[in-house]
Amino acid sequence: MDLVLEVADHYVLDDLYAKVLPASLAANIPVKWQKLLGLNSGFSNSTILQETLNSKNAVKECRRFYGQVPFLFDMSTTSFASLLPRSSILREFLSLWVIVTIFGLLLYLFTASLSYVFVFDKSIFNHPRYLKNQMAMEIKLAVSAIPWMSMLTVPWFVMELNGHSKLYMKIDYENHGVRKLIIEYFTFIFFTDCGVYLAHRWLHWPRVYRALHKPHHKWLVCTPFASHSFHPVDGFLQSISYHIYPLILPLHKVSYLILFTFVNFWTVMIHDGQYLSNNPAVNGTACHTVHHLYFNYNYGQFTTLWDRLGGSYRRPDDSLFDPKLRDAKETWDAQVKEVEHFIKEVEGDDNDRIYENDPNTKKNN
């Protein structure tokens, strides 16, 4: 995340912080608090320091602590002009919270919109368990949750910026560095798939489900906009393994950004209602549809491995992959019958869903 933050600092945030919180404000703050908070009291020799850091003799590689040495861009005088220097944990937290929130919202809305226009099976709107105003409710919950999920996530990024990770930038080509980099993609998927499975299964414990996970299961059949429609603590808990991985295992910094983007794409894809993959090893859209319909199956994120080992795997019905049967009344009636059984089992009488297309059960109390 230091790469993203340095780009933001160079093009926007250095100037913004220098204008909003100039170093001259330090004159009004006791020295004790300046040291405690890591504030910048202003450099009379900032030009000399800037020239030293930008010189050809400076080692231009990512340091253990962000903000000490430039990597992508040369520093300028504004890099030293704010009360909050680049290396300030307060500044790092605030900057990353804004960046992650904006990027998260844009990625969610952009990816889900593309999926809705080009991929999403809109016959789902006719399903008897599609809710009234469902898509608007999905978007509202996701947009309101993403800033809070970002706030919970940012401390992990701050840890990485301050040396508490095994993220790296330099590839050791002489010692099979490229091969190791490729292997990291597979180990990341393997590790995080297990982590999501464990977190997701815990979220289905009755008390935890009612407190945190129930909002996401309001959607019995999904649109792509359901992908990030979580209680913020729920969404954060399911993402923890993505942050634990680089703390304990090596991961290239660019791969880290690619994988985080991929995870968001994948999350949208498994909510798009297009059952393209019937691979028994892949936890695709069909498997996740089974999870939303029947609650107690297919907790994994990418593969079916952990569900098989944990005894929670349920193979999607063949009717999901047959265009003639998928939207047939008989198929939907069978789904509704089983769905109602699981709603009663998991939620009891606490069911406030109002359905769009089922006049007999518009509100199921």
UniProtKB/Swiss-Prot annotation:
Keywords annotated in UniProt: Endoplasmic reticulum, Iron, Isopeptide bond, Lipid biosynthesis, Lipid metabolism, Membrane, Oxidoreductase, Steroid biosynthesis, Steroid metabolism, Sterol biosynthesis, Sterol metabolism, Transmembrane, Transmembrane helix, Ubl conjugation
One GO term of the cellular component aspect?
endoplasmic reticulum lumen
Q: Which catalytic reaction applies to this protein?
A: episterol + 2 Fe(II)-[cytochrome b5] + O2 + 2 H(+) = 5-dehydroepisterol + 2 Fe(III)-[cytochrome b5] + 2 H2O
Q: What pathway annotation does it carry?
A: Steroid metabolism; ergosterol biosynthesis; ergosterol from zymosterol: step 3/5
Residues in the Lumenal compartment per record:
114-140, 264-365
UniProt induction comment? The ERG3 promoter contains 2 upstream activation sequences, UAS1 and UAS2. UAS1 regulates gene expression but does not affect sterol regulation. UAS2 is required for sterol regulation. The absence of sterol esterification leads to a decrease of ERG3 expression.
Which residues lie toward the Cytoplasmic compartment?
1-92, 162-242
Residue ranges annotated as motif Histidine box-2: 213-217
Which GO MF terms does the UniProt record name?
Answer: C-5 sterol desaturase activity; delta7-sterol 5(6)-desaturase activity; iron ion binding
Q: Which family does it belong to?
A: Belongs to the sterol desaturase family.
What exactly does this protein do? Answer: The third module or late pathway involves the ergosterol synthesis itself through consecutive reactions that mainly occur in the endoplasmic reticulum (ER) membrane. Firstly, the squalene synthase ERG9 catalyzes the condensation of 2 farnesyl pyrophosphate moieties to form squalene, which is the precursor of all steroids.
Its name, as the record gives it, is Delta(7)-sterol 5(6)-desaturase ERG3
| Species assigned in the record | Saccharomyces cerevisiae (strain ATCC 204508 / S288c) (Baker's yeast)
